[in-house]
From Swiss-Prot:
Keywords: Ribonucleoprotein, Ribosomal protein
Stated family: Belongs to the bacterial ribosomal protein bL19 family.
GO CC annotation: cytosolic large ribosomal subunit
Role of this protein: This protein is located at the 30S-50S ribosomal subunit interface and may play a role in the structure and function of the aminoacyl-tRNA binding site.
Protein name: Large ribosomal subunit protein bL19
Classification lineage: Bacteria, Pseudomonadati, Pseudomonadota, Gammaproteobacteria, Lysobacterales
GO biological process terms, semicolon-separated: translation
Record keyword Transit peptide present: no
Any one Pfam family match given in the protein's UniProt record, by short name: Ribosomal_L19
Source organism (scientific name): Xylella fastidiosa (strain Temecula1 / ATCC 700964)
Length: 136
């Protein structure tokens, strides 16, 4: 693909990315509010779990969230800029060293826990306090 075509595609993709997505990484526990259509009405469904993988590819970015539902591991892949995603909320920052956490599939119970990144959590709380103090 020529440089001109790549620049045109990059320009188009940047115009399509309209909303801000919070910065999260592997190991973080997040809540994804998804729009679900049932019949003729639409409602929000919360999907809470651990991010086990991310794919950063501009408009085609995606992330995989794993949760345990009724004793079974359930994974769901979300397109980061999909219109069905209403919001993404970060519940907890995890401290991991691997880029992909597929090894969690083989673990269960307490072995599948991820250590919390207390430094990142404290930094975010401090940032929120300063923003609130400036606004108030």
């Amino acid at each position: 693909m020529s440089k001109l075509n790549k620049s045109i595609i990059a320009e188009f993709e940047s115009a399509q990315i309209t909303r801000q997505v919070p910065q999260f990484s592997q190991g973080d526990t997040i809540v994804v509010n998804v729009k679900v259509k049932e019949g003729n009405r639409e409602r929000l469904q919360a999907y809470e779990g651990v991010v086990i993988a991310t794919k950063n590819a501009g408009l085609n970015s995606a992330f995989t969230v794993r949760k345990i539902s009724h004793g079974y591991g359930v994974e769901r892949v979300f397109q980061t800029h999909s219109p069905i995603i209403e919001s993404i909320e970060i519940k907890r920052r995890g401290k991991v060293r691997a880029a992909k956490l597929y090894y969690l599939r083989g673990l269960e119970g307490k072995a599948a826990r991820i250590k919390e990144d207390l430094a990142a959590t404290a930094h975010e709380k401090l940032a929120r306090k300063t923003v609130t103090a400036k606004a108030g």
